[in-house]
Every structure is written in structure tokens, then in C-alpha cells.
UniProtKB/Swiss-Prot annotation:
The gene is LECRK22. It holds the Pfam family Pkinase. Residues 289-309 have a biased composition (Pro residues). Residues 283-314 are annotated as: Disordered. Residues 27-272 are annotated as: Legume-lectin like. This is Putative L-type lectin-domain containing receptor kinase II.2. GO terms for molecular function: ATP binding; carbohydrate binding; protein serine kinase activity; transmembrane receptor protein serine/threonine kinase activity.
């Protein structure tokens, strides 16, 4: 019997321990007004001193971390919420300068110590892993140092960091005063208690950060932090943390010291996942300690016995003082020169005398670098054969798209810049506006209006798109692009050949209007000018037969590509799709086949619900008319506009003359096309062809 009781007692103890462990794993909130018994994981300089969490001390180039030991479950599921809220009180004592700063951190693990230069990165990153998406770190920094590693120039700012020391958003430390109706600035490294509120709404995907000094003298009676929380947050940013967090995460703090030092204290902390954190009772929070003593140093040696001063000793002493002063000044000048050259090299641009005439359209590299947060991966909108495109925001609040391409000196950069300036003068509601450019070393940055709805290509072919375009929206986009091409071909001061018309180069603005973009292959020429044969460029399925045969781009080759574009939008498929059955592989041939069978409506995009059959038939016939193998049979853009608006009747077409193979061009046309290019020597090595979108 005694044995049975002992066995039962043993299993009861095991069950209690397991239950305690399970309950501990489910804890999603805590409050600390004192850290004496706090369940924290500490490393580096971090320690608990008299109930205060002491993150950093007077050690140089070191880090300190403190994390709550129990992980938080941030997996996305119907039963869990990604919302969280936290409050904490901190104080920073500057010892030499204001120190490097500290941060509230949500990280996938507690041990985030790095060797090397981590102290310059708030103890969160180092030079090798900064700006890596695999970091899975969200931090709110309280930065008291301006360093070359970060873009922010202020040594007293609050920032939201995602996987990098470069903040997604930042602002100088201040709080909104309801009585004065404005923001009031204060110092983070003030030796005084400062409150921080961080709230993330998982439904709205909105992160708010608010800061304010704790009132002095501190209330002796119970006094909740919520009563002094400013109405307006300092920072407010839309962030999808499900793309950052990696399931189980840890919450805590990170601090660091570089060559400048500071004591950083956390005096109270409240946290809750899935709701609002409990307000801290300020009457229970410990005051900041008295100013920490300066670093200890060995006692000075006893003074030597006094000797009567002599004129020689006085002269020697003056010489030493002068030498030390001159050496110090020289060192400071060298250091200043080094920092100046470092920043100058970092933001160095290429600027030649002939570019002065284009100066109103030049942007400084420094401003663009800040606008797109240092070419970070999370700012990347797309990439292709002509460079990468990043999203940015100018200080005025204007959103921009910046294309980063590498230019070839042999192309004649002066001519290229002149064409950029010409493109900057193009003004049409259905063109993506080029705002300006910047040259730096071997790269060129082109600045455009930002189009919030991305490319038409994405709407037509991305299966993950939540919403398809309606029939009326597609028709409106086709009409908009046609209007833009009429402007380029006939209404501007020169003839502009786009040479790369396709769905991936049509961008959609906030109202889903189509705008023709990507002028990377565009060419300008005067009206009546004989056209030169050039390197053959374009995309398979959009290139007119005479372009590949003769190497001369004209308005008719643009119209051929526009015809392929019309078919692409109406049919919801690319001009060439190798995975389809042979007779359907080439869209133009498939439409021609269905036209001859009198089953033209079979090619209309099956994703469309309701559509107007009469309009669809007109657009399909217009696409085929633009795609005739003989360029003389293709309409001009002015006639195309008339057909689209119903002001003219589209002529009857033959479905047997779709543009494939060698074109049927008259001798007169061939003579005109080759008049100035008889010396051109073409081979397949001269052809630059793209397949599909980019």
C-alpha cells in the first residue's frame, strides 16, 4: 500500500510540473514594477541592480540584452492574434556623449550577440547581417547617437526598425501636448524617467509608437501611466508583421555603447499579446538612480617634492603645451577630413559641365538614397533586364518609383541624358511621368511617379491577385494606352517610338487608369527624318516582321506591338505561351484561326464574367488589323482612336494576313527604310530579344 501511495505521489508531482510548464507556455502578458524577481534572460552588460534593469554601463563597445524567458506565439491562425501592446519606463544617463542608444525588440531568439561591430548597431545586427530578411527582427529604437551606419542625422530620435539599423520611419523625440496643441521636444538621454507606449493592431496592421516624460515630481499615490499618454502617437506605420515574425518570438530590450558611453535603465515594463497592456502604476516605479559615478581609475601617484621654478622649466612646459595643442588640432582636422571624404564618397555623383542644362531634372543621390531607405529589399517593386525599381518617398511626402540601371559609357551618355531630358518634358495623362534622374559612378537612377496598383501584367496573369479587372476597366486601359501612343507618334514636337509596348510596361494608377511606362528602349526623331537601322530590340510576340527583317523601328512597328497588346488584354493571355497546344501557342495565329471558324468569342478571357460581345469583336478585329504582316495595311494611331470611339467603321480584314514570317513590303517602303542604313551590317548577334514580361 505504501508503495502505491509513493507511486501516486510521484505521478501527481509530475502532472503538476507538466501543467505548470504548459500554463507558462501560454502566458501572454506580464507586468513588472520592480525587476528583483523578474523572469528575464540577461546577457552582455545587462544586470539587475536594486530592482532596476541595467542594460549598459560604462564599458565601451559592448552590448546588453534582456528578454522575457517565455516565448510568444505569433503564428497566424484563427485562434491567435498578432496584436500586441507594451509600456515601459526607461532612463538614460550620458557618461561620455549620449551613448549609442537602446531598443525594444521582438526577435526569434534570445541570444542575439554578434561579434565585431554589433555595438554600432544597437546590439541587434552587425555589418554582415544588417538588412537581411532572415533576421526576423522588429525593433523600436531610442537612438541617442548619429552614426554613419544609420541614415538618420539626429542624435535624439525614435525609429521603427525592420531587420536593419536603418529605420522604416523615425522622428525626433517629442510628445503631443493637448493644452498647447503642438509637439514638445525633449532629450532621451536626460537622466529622467521616460514612458514609451508601443501598440500594434493586427487587424489594421498599424504600429503606433508614443513617448512622453514621466511627470516630476512623480506622484506618490497610485497614478496610472494611461492618464498621461498623449492623444497622438509620435510614429504611426502600416506594417504586416506576419511577414517579419517567424512563429515563436521573444520580447525584450537591447542596448549598446560604442566609443561613447551611457548607463541605460528599464524601470518598469508591461506587455500583453492579443490586447491592451496593463497600465503601469507610476507610484510603484523606482526612481532613476543617482547619477552613476565616473569610471574608476587608480589613485594618482604622490606629487614630487616641490622644486623652485626656473625659467628653463617654464619654457619646456610651454613647449609641451603648444605641441599637445597643435597635435590635437591636427588630429581633429584629419578626423574631420576623413569623415567628410567618407560621406562625400558614399554620396558621390557624376556631374559634367554639359549636364548643367538639365539641372532642374537632376536629383541628388543623397536625397534619393534617403527616400528609398538605402535600396533595401523591402522597398523593391520589381526587377528585370533593365534594372531594379524601388519605392521611395520624398521629404515633401510625394511617393516615387526609382529605377536603378547601369549605363554603358560607349552609348554616349550625353545623348542619353538629352533623351532623358526630352522624356521629362513629355506630358500626358496616360504616360508615367519621368520626374528626373541622377548619375552616380557607373549607375543611373531614373525617378518616376509612383503607380500604386502596379503593372497590368500582374492583374492579367497573377493567379494570387484578389480581384480581376472588369471588362469596362480593360477597355478603358486600352483606350488610355492608345491615347498615349497618339500623343507620342503625332502630337508631340518629335516622333517618339516606344519600341516595347506590352502589358508589363502598362502601369495602373490609383483609379486603375492605364499609363504607358518604361521608356528604356524609346527613340526620338524629327518628323520626315530618314530612319536609321539599329540594333533589333523587343519582346517575342510583340515584334513586327519587318523589324526583325530590316532592323528599322517605325510608328508601324509600335502599332504592331499595340495590336498584340489589345489581344493580350482581351484574351487574358500572353502572345506566346509554349505550354499550350501547338495551334494555340501563338495568340495571333489562334485568334486568326477562330476568326476563320467564326468562333471569335472563344478567345475572350474566361475569367471575365459579363462582357459586351460587340465591343470584344471590335477589339479583336482591331488587334488583328494592327498586326497585319504588311505595315502599310496597319492603321495609324489617329484612325485607331476613331475606331475605338465609334467615330469610324473598322475596315474588313483578312485573317490570313496576320503578321508572321517575312513581311510583304513594297519596294518603295524598302527603299525608304534602307536609304540611310545601307551600310548597316546585321547578324543575329545584333539582336536583343526579351521573352515575356519583365
Amino acid at each position: 500500500m505504501a508503495g502505491v501511495l509513493r507511486s501516486l505521489r510521484f505521478w501527481m508531482i509530475i502532472c503538476v510540473q507538466v501543467l505548470s510548464l504548459v500554463l507558462a507556455q501560454d502566458r501572454d502578458e506580464f507586468v513588472y514594477h520592480d525587476f528583483s524577481q523578474a523572469d528575464l534572460h540577461l546577457d552582455g552588460m545587462a544586470s539587475i541592480d536594486d530592482g532596476r534593469l541595467h542594460l549598459t554601463n560604462n564599458t565601451t563597445k559592448s552590448t546588453g540584452h534582456a528578454f522575457w524567458k517565455i516565448p510568444m506565439n505569433f503564428t497566424t491562425s484563427p485562434s491567435s492574434s498578432l496584436s500586441f501592446s507594451t509600456e515601459f519606463v526607461f532612463a538614460i544617463f550620458p557618461l561620455l556623449g549620449d551613448g549609442q542608444g537602446m531598443a525594444f525588440v521582438v526577435a526569434p531568439f534570445m541570444d542575439i550577440r554578434y561579434s565585431g561591430d554589433a555595438a554600432s548597431y544597437l546590439g541587434l545586427f552587425n555589418r554582415k547581417n544588417d538588412n537581411k530578411t532572415e533576421n526576423h527582427i522588429l525593433a523600436v529604437e531610442l537612438d541617442t547617437n548619429s552614426s554613419p551606419e544609420a541614415i538618420e542625422d539626429s542624435d535624439n530620435h525614435v525609429g521603427i526598425d525592420i531587420n536593419s539599423i536603418i529605420s522604416e520611419d523615425s522622428a525626433n523625440a517629442s510628445y503631443f501636448s493637448g493644452t498647447e496643441g503642438k509637439n514638445i521636444s525633449f532629450r532621451l538621454a536626460s537622466e529622467k524617467s521616460i514612458l514609451v507606449w508601443i501598440d500594434y493592431n493586427g487587424t489594421e496592421k498599424l504600429l503606433n509608437v508614443t513617448v512622453a516624460p514621466v511627470p516630476t515630481p512623480k506622484p506618490a499615490l497610485p497614478y496610472l501611466s494611461s492618464s498621461i499618454k498623449p492623444r497622438k502617437p509620435l510614429l504611426s506605420r502600416f506594417i504586416n508583421i506576419s511577414e517579419i515574425f517567424n512563429g515563436t518570438m521573444f520580447v525584450g530590450f537591447s542596448g549598446s555603447t560604442g566609443t561613447v558611453k551611457s548607463d541605460q535603465y528599464i524601470l518598469g515594463w508591461s506587455f500583453k499579446k492579443g490586447g491592451q497592456a496593463e497600465s503601469l502604476d507610476l507610484s510603484k516605479i523606482l526612481d532613476p538612480p543617482n547619477r552613476p559615478p565616473p569610471p574608476s581609475s587608480p589613485p594618482p601617484p604622490p606629487p614630487p617634492p616641490p622644486t623652485p621654478p626656473t625659467s628653463r622649466s617654464k619654457d619646456s612646459k610651454n613647449i609641451i603645451i603648444i605641441c599637445v595643442t597643435v597635435t590635437s588640432i591636427a588630429f581633429l582636422l584629419m578626423l574631420g577630413g576623413f569623415l567628410y571624404l567618407y560621406k562625400k564618397k558614399k554620396y558621390a555623383e557624376v556631374l559634367e559641365h554639359w549636364e548643367n542644362e538639365y539641372s532642374p531634372q537632376r536629383y541628388s543621390f543623397r536625397n534619393l538614397y534617403k527616400a528609398i531607405r538605402g535600396f533595401r529589399e523591402n522597398r523593391l517593386l520589381g526587377a528585370g533586364g533593365f534594372g531594379k525599381v524601388y519605392k521611395g518617398e520624398l521629404p515633401s511626402g510625394t511617393q516615387i518609383a526609382v529605377k536603378r540601371v547601369y549605363h554603358n559609357a560607349e552609348q554616349g551618355m550625353k545623348q542619353y541624358a538629352a533623351e532623358i531630358a526630352s522624356m521629362g518634358r513629355l506630358r500626358h495623362k496616360n504616360l508615367v511621368q519621368l520626374l528626373g534622374y541622377c548619375r552616380r559612378k557607373g549607375e543611373l537612377l531614373l525617378v518616376y511617379d509612383y503607380m500604386p496598383n502596379g503593372s497590368l501584367d500582374d492583374y492579367l496573369f497573377n493567379k494570387n491577385k484578389l480581384k480581376d479587372l472588369t471588362w469596362s476597366q480593360r477597355v478603358n486601359i486600352i483606350k488610355g494606352v492608345a491615347s498615349a501612343l497618339l500623343y507620342l507618334h503625332e502630337e508631340w514636337e518629335q516622333v517618339v517610338l516606344h519600341r516595347d509596348i506590352k502589358a508589363s510596361n502598362i502601369l495602373l494608377d490609383a483609379d486603375l487608369n492605364g499609363r504607358l511606362g518604361d521608356f528604356g528602349l524609346a527613340r526620338f526623331h524629327d518628323r520626315g527624318e530618314n530612319l536609321q537601322a539599329t540594333r533589333v530590340v523587343g519582346t517575342i510576340g510583340y515584334m513586327a516582321p519587318e523589324l526583325t527583317a530590316m532592323g528599322v523601328a517605325t510608328t508601324k512597328t509600335d502599332i504592331y506591338a499595340f495590336g498584340s497588346f489589345i489581344l493580350e488584354v482581351v484574351c487574358g493571355r500572353r502572345p506566346v505561351e509554349p505550354d499550350r497546344p501547338p495551334e494555340q501557342m501563338h495568340l495571333l495565329k489562334w485568334v486568326a484561326t477562330c476568326g476563320k471558324r467564326d468562333t471569335l468569342m472563344d478567345v475572350v478571357d474566361s475569367k471575365l464574367g459579363d462582357f459586351k460581345a460587340k465591343e470584344a469583336k471590335l477589339l479583336l478585329k482591331l488587334g488583328m488589323l494592327c498586326s497585319q504582316s504588311n505595315p502599310e495595311s496597319r492603321p495609324s494611331m489617329r484612325h485607331i482612336i476613331q475606331y475605338l470611339e465609334g467615330n469610324a467603321t473598322i475596315p474588313s480584314i483578312s485573317f490570313d494576313t496576320a503578321g508572321f514570317g517575312i513581311p510583304n513590303i513594297s519596294n518603295e517602303t524598302i527603299t525608304q527604310m534602307t536609304a540611310t542604313s545601307s551600310s548597316a551590317n546585321f547578324s543575329f548577334e545584333d539582336v536583343t530579344i526579351l521573352f515575356g514580361g519583365r
